[in-house]
Design a protein with these regions (language model features):
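Short S/T/G/P-rich N-terminal loop/turn motif that feeds into the first structured element of a domain
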Residues: 1-147
């Protein structure tokens, strides 16, 4: 995963990457099958690169307004933030789907178990009776491979 402060920084990184690929003997192919998502950071509390991240993606009912979808995303984000501590909330900017992403860090899988249990407890107390209109949800755990 990559983070950019703004689209100007993204453009500078991409320009350098494309120049590096075209100046070598052949372009580097790093991925087999993937999709790129450029997101807008709505709230940033994850300021250091943790060993692992939980990336949770939420799509809400298309009948909701953009503000209603944001409201639901914020409700879920608050649960993750309280349970995991440092988390980021991002929203689709460019890419294949209109989603909200909640990204939280953890040190190891013991830490994940503790933070997950805390989040589950908070969710059960605060959102079990909420109509959140979640259409699709997925989670991915990613490991940091370099600093």
């Amino acid at each position: 995963y990559c983070n950019f402060d703004d689209m100007k920084q993204f453009a500078a990184v991409m320009k350098k990457s494309i120049a590096a690929q075209s100046s070598g003997p052949s372009p580097v192919q790093s991925y087999a099958s993937h999709s790129d998502n450029i997101v807008a950071v709505l709230e940033r509390n994850l300021t250091e690169a943790p060993n692992y991240i939980l990336n949770s993606e939420y799509n809400f009912g298309p009948y909701l307004t953009a503000n209603e979808q944001l409201d639901r995303a914020n409700k879920l984000y608050n649960v993750y933030k309280e349970g995991f501590g440092a988390c980021n909330l991002t929203q689709h900017r460019y890419g294949p789907e209109y989603s909200f992403y909640i990204v939280c860090g953890f040190d190891d899988f013991d830490d994940f178990a503790k933070k997950s249990a805390k989040s589950d407890s908070i969710y059960e107390k605060s959102l079990m009776d909420e109509k959140l209109d979640i259409k699709v949800h997925s989670d991915n755990m990613l490991i940091k491979v370099m600093d």
